[in-house]
Design a protein with these regions (language model features):
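CheY-like receiver
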Residues: 116, 124-148, 157, 248-272
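Receiver (REC) domain switch/output surface
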Residues: 103, 114-124, 237-250
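Acidic, metal-coordinating helix/loop segments flanking the phosphotransfer/catalytic sites
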Residues: 21, 35-53, 61, 158-176, ...
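Two-component/phosphorelay signaling modules centered on CheY-like receiver
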Residues: 14-34, 137-157
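Short amphipathic alpha-helix used as the core "switch/output" element in two-component signaling
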Residues: 66-78, 118-120, 167, 189-201
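Hydrophobic/aromatic residues positioned on beta-strands within the core alpha/beta folds
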Residues: 84-85, 207
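Alpha4 helix (beta4-alpha4-beta5 surface) of REC/receiver domains from two-component response regulators
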Residues: 66-67, 87-103, 190, 210-226
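C-terminal output helix
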Residues: 91, 109-117, 214, 232-242
Length: 272
């Protein structure tokens, strides 16, 4: 059972802090809540407690974005930074990315938004064991790189074929498996079944060329929680992983994708 988190609410407005604190208490009565009205109080709180989720107003007085980034990287690398704002300024996704934010949400904050973030924290605060099964070395390397760009923390093991995948699954834990449908030595769906039998809570993403929706739905029979069509980029795999764990995909990631469509990175399925 995941322990209740420590939530830091940093906002100059007392009513906003109170409303957010009450919402958190409704959703997770065990959560510990710390408040800060300015940057000085924020830094003291970050130094004095292990904060799991930081809700911070983008206009908090005496605040330095570099301090938030430093805490995100060294104080609690698994901590979530959520920027809160009355309106979205131009280039807000780039600003959010610079401070290592997980998401940006607009005031007033409703229980639905807060609940989604608390649910995300329960998964993102843990190190997850991931098994990547694909005959292509370049593909496995790219999947590892893309997963490393996400807010998830993965311990990744790789297998080029189904038999190695089954052996690895029997030898250690699996929280997420990403399995290419066309394996050279063993039916991929049989691999999915074996992993599902051994690790019933594991999320299993099948991947490969696009298939019909009806076939995608049939994959659930074999324990698959989703299908990731190739070629894919960071947005696609990040969204699929969020959905496989039942999590809402951050608005920020969607916005960053829109900004970067003209500067697309490498995709699986291209010559690497």
């Amino acid at each position: 059972v995941t322990a209740s988190p420590t939530i830091l609410i940093a906002d100059p407005d007392e009513e906003t802090r109170l409303a957010l604190a009450e919402a958190v208490a409704r959703l997770d009565p065990g959560a510990r809540i710390v408040e800060a009205a300015d940057g000085g109080a924020l830094n003291r709180a970050l130094a004095g407690s292990r904060i799991d989720v930081l809700f911070i107003d983008v206009l908090l007085p005496q605040t330095n974005g570099a301090d938030i980034r430093r805490w995100r990287e060294t104080g609690n690398p698994r901590g979530l930074v959520v920027l809160v704002t009355d309106m979205l300024a131009p280039r807000w996704p780039a600003t959010a990315r610079r401070v290592g934010a997980y998401d940006v949400i607009l005031k007033p904050l409703g229980d639905l938004h807060i609940g989604r973030l608390l649910a995300a924290n329960q998964v993102l605060s843990r190190s997850l064991d991931c098994l990547v099964v694909d005959p292509g070395q370049a593909t496995r390397t790219l999947v590892r790189k893309l997963l490393g760009q996400s807010h998830f923390a993965f311990r990744i093991r790789e297998a080029a074929g189904g038999r190695d995948a089954v052996r690895l699954a029997e030898a250690g834990p699996v929280d997420l498996a990403i399995i290419e449908l066309s394996l050279p030595d063993y039916p991929a769906l049989e691999v999915a079944c074996r992993i599902n039998d051994r690790h019933p809570a594991a999320r299993i993403l099948m991947t490969g060329p696009r298939i019909e929706e009806g076939v995608q739905r049939q994959l659930a029979t074999f324990g698959a929680s989703g299908f990731l069509p190739k070629p894919f980029q960071f947005f696609d795999i990040d969204k699929a992983v969020h959905e496989s764990f039942g999590l809402w995909h951050p608005y920020l990631i969607n916005a960053l994708r829109r900004e970067s469509l003209l500067d697309a990175g490498p995709t699986v399925g291209q010559v690497v």
